[in-house]
């Protein structure tokens, strides 16, 4: 995806308020992998309540579209499939119509969102040209990333492996409250 698809996070934009931070090709390659895997896993960590998960995905897709001033055909097709799925999982059509997304579905959707973030923030022809700053796209998935960072922080402070499963995810709190 990075090499053939031209999905390399090279220009990070003006992170500290000055000029753009531009990474070398190899550092950008590693940083892209880190970001895509991180966002993918962050979405996987909120998949415990399907309606909550799909609302976060819809918000991310709408955010991408607003920031980039365009609706891509792939993004529109994705939203057209996701909106009925979300309605079904809200229980508006009855409990028997709910669909479990599972790990693979959540990871595929997270990967799709992460790839779209990279594609809208990078110009494959001119590294210095950025239509959307990468840091702006992070606001589209703020709750998802904050949940992941919070869970990692709790695991580190408890001296646990960040890869162990637990009930620290935000959807467990909602489930415990009866949602």
Indicate residue ranges for each PLM-predicted region.
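Short helix-to-coil transition segments within interhelical loops
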Residues: 48-49, 177-179
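"…together with the soluble PPM/PP2C metallo-phosphatase catalytic core" -> "…together
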Residues: 1-148
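Cytosolic, membrane-interface loops and tails of multi-pass inner-membrane proteins
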Residues: 95-96, 149-178
């Amino acid at each position: 995806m990075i090499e053939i698809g031209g999905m390399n996070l090279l220009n990070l934009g003006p992170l500290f308020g000055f000029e753009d931070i531009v990474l070398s090709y190899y550092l950008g390659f590693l940083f892209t992998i880190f970001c895509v895997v991180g966002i993918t896993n962050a979405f996987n960590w909120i998949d415990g309540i399907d309606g909550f998960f799909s609302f976060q995905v819809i918000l991310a897709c709408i955010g991408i579209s607003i920031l980039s001033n365009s609706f891509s055909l792939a993004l529109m097709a994705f939203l057209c499939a996701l909106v009925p799925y979300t309605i079904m999982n809200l229980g508006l059509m009855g409990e028997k119509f709910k669909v479990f997304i599972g790990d693979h579905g959540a990871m595929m959707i997270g990967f799709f969102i992460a790839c779209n973030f990279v594609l809208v923030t990078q110009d494959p022809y001119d590294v210095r040209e950025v239509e959307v700053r990468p840091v702006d796209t992070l606001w589209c998935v703020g709750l998802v990333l904050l949940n992941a960072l919070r869970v990692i922080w709790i695991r580190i402070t408890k001296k646990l492996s960040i890869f162990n499963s637990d009930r620290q995810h935000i959807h467990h709190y909602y489930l415990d409250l009866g949602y």
